[in-house]
A protein has these predicted regions:
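Sec/Tat signal peptide C-region and signal peptidase I cleavage site
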Residues: 16-20
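Bacterial N-terminal signal peptides
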Residues: 5-15
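SH3/SH3-like beta-barrel superfamily modules
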Residues: 22-33, 61-104
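N-terminal low-complexity, Pro/Thr/Ser-rich intrinsically disordered segments
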Residues: 21-45, 118
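Tryptophan-anchored aromatic micro-motifs
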Residues: 111-130, 225-236
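Short alpha-helix capping/helix-loop boundary micro-motifs
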Residues: 53, 57-63
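N-terminal glycine/threonine-rich, aromatic-flanked beta-hairpin/loop signature
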Residues: 127-182, 212-222
Length: 236
């Protein structure tokens, strides 16, 4: 059985939530935040570690049942003591994301690609960001996200909230910050801490993941693009 399937089964048994947006929004991220890609290199399964209520500690009570296996790739958000906070997102069709703590000794950095490969369809559930070549060496970014689509009553009553963007960018490197709703119709690099009605997004390419964080103004109520997306097959 694949590692992501094992993890999904374990987390279901534990009652862990499937996050609609597992990433924090831009306003909550610390200055200089830079997620990185790392790989499980431990010789045995790396169990998640509890934090809080007397944990972490070298006890069974502080060890989660859920685990990852050698070769699994995670997004590292930060470090606390001997542990790192990570996000693991499985593949299609569920794209289940899990956020938790792992022993730092179980991970090793993955070298960044020499040339960022932005082009592709990046998905998490029904939400997606599609990136395609555009004239002049730029890239077209199209995104769609929703909230409430899993509630049949909301669907029947038209109560599903949505968000979308469509813009053209020329990223330099493996991250980009932009506002698709800038007044002049052109993408702009904005300070996410500035109070603005404009939608602001920041993307980090950590292949096979695309990490996104927005300022909470990119769609209807509760809609967010703040998530971890994985490469997915292109829509026919």
């Amino acid at each position: 059985m694949r590692a992501c399937a094992l993890l999904s089964l374990l987390l279901t048994a534990l009652g862990a939530p499937a996050f609609a947006g597992v990433m924090d929004g831009l306003d909550s991220l610390p200055a200089g935040f830079a997620p990185r890609l790392e790989k499980i290199v431990a010789a045995k399964p790396a169990h998640f570690v509890k934090h809080g209520d007397g944990c972490p500690a070298a006890t069974d009570a502080c060890t989660e049942k859920a685990y990852l296996v050698p070769g699994d790739l995670v997004i590292v958000l930060g470090t606390q003591g001997d542990d790192v906070e990570v996000i693991f997102t499985g593949g299609a069709p569920r794209f289940r994301s899990t956020r938790g703590w792992l022993p730092r000794s179980a991970l090793a950095p993955v070298p960044a690609a020499a040339t960022p490969a932005w082009v592709g369809r990046w998905a998490n559930g029904d939400d997606f960001i599609a990136i395609t070549p555009a004239p002049g060496g730029s890239l077209a970014f199209v995104g769609s996200a929703s909230w409430g689509g899993g509630d049949p009553a909301r669907v029947a009553n038209g109560g599903v909230n949505v968000g979308a963007f469509d813009t053209t960018l020329a990223p330099r490197g493996a991250s980009v910050t932009f506002s698709p709703s800038a007044d002049d119709g052109k993408p702009a690099t904005l300070d996410p801490k500035v109070d603005s009605d404009d939608c602001v997004l920041r993307l980090w390419l950590l292949d096979p993941y695309l990490v996104a964080a927005d300022n909470g103004k990119c769609g209807g109520m509760n809609v967010t693009f703040s998530n971890v997306y994985r490469r997915a097959p292109a829509k026919p």
